[in-house]
Swiss-Prot record:
GO terms for biological process: translation. It comes from Karelsulcia muelleri (strain GWSS) (Sulcia muelleri). GO terms for molecular function: structural constituent of ribosome. The keyword Ribosomal protein applies. One of its GO terms (cellular component) is cytoplasm. This is Large ribosomal subunit protein bL33. The gene is rpmG. Pfam families: Ribosomal_L33.
Amino acid sequence: MSKKNIRIQVIIECTEHKNSGLSGTSRYVTTKNKKNNPERLELKKYNSILNRKTIHKEIK
């Protein structure tokens, strides 16, 4: 029998870009381990529209 898969795909979206009012969105798709990280994921990723690294948070 195979084990249940605990790694799930999540979408992370830029918080600074959302508040800036500019058009478009900066989103990434990544995976996380539900067992080790039950809370929402927060990573610093590159935003090509703002041309810098910004904080991206997990969305539902």
